[in-house]
Regions:
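C-terminal motif of bacterial Sec signal peptides marking the signal peptidase cleavage site
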Residues: 20-23
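Short aromatic-glycine-(Arg/Gly/Cys) micro-motifs in beta-strand/loop hairpins
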Residues: 111-118
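Phosphoinositide-dependent membrane-docking surfaces
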Residues: 86-109
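C-terminal partner/receptor-binding element of secreted or periplasmic proteins
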Residues: 118-150
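Bacterial signal peptide processing site
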Residues: 25-27
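Bacterial N-terminal signal peptides that target proteins for export
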Residues: 1-12
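A short, structured loop/turn motif at beta-sheet edges
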Residues: 67, 100-103, 130
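Conserved beta-hairpin
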Residues: 34-89
């Protein structure tokens, strides 16, 4: 039946257009306060960065160390088994030197990507809410600016 084929083609076309219109989440645009560490004081800013990282959903952070030069954190990493199902967990760690940070992007889905000047991803965090993603971004950029000034 020609009418049924037309309806089927329209339905397929509508599904395809809907799928393609989803796209990627957009980066949140805002001006970071690069004096935040100076305004809060270094110990308070370090504690806020630690507290924010502990609330990270992915990766689940278990230990954080913040110095004037770098951010170091340990987290649980799943060991993938057959068909991608995790069979256990191991500890992993990451150290991000503030001088190596080129840019920090926070997205609408609470994902934060920390990139070097060469666009290499230095860290990737997913937070439960936009406030934690914004605070993590602001503090990293403020620590980077403070390190660049010294």
């Amino acid at each position: 039946m020609p009418g049924q084929n037309t309806r089927y083609a329209v339905l397929v076309l509508l599904c395809l257009v809907s799928f393609l219109s989803l796209g990627c989440p957009a980066a949140i645009q805002y001006q970071a306060n690069e004096r935040l560490v100076d305004e809060l004081g270094v110990p308070q800013a370090q504690q806020r960065l630690k507290d924010t990282l502990y609330r990270s959903i992915n990766p689940p952070v278990t230990e954080v160390d913040v110095t004037n030069d770098f951010l170091h954190y340990r987290y649980r990493q799943a060991i993938p088994g057959p068909f991608g199902a995790p069979v256990g967990f191991t500890m992993a760690e990451n150290r991000v030197f503030f001088t190596n940070i080129g840019r920090v992007d926070a997205f609408e889905n609470h994902l934060v990507l920390v990139r070097s000047a060469a666009e290499i991803v230095l860290a990737q965090m997913v937070f439960a809410n936009a406030e934690d993603a914004r605070m993590f971004t602001e503090l990293l950029l403020a620590f980077r600016a403070r390190r660049a000034r010294s």
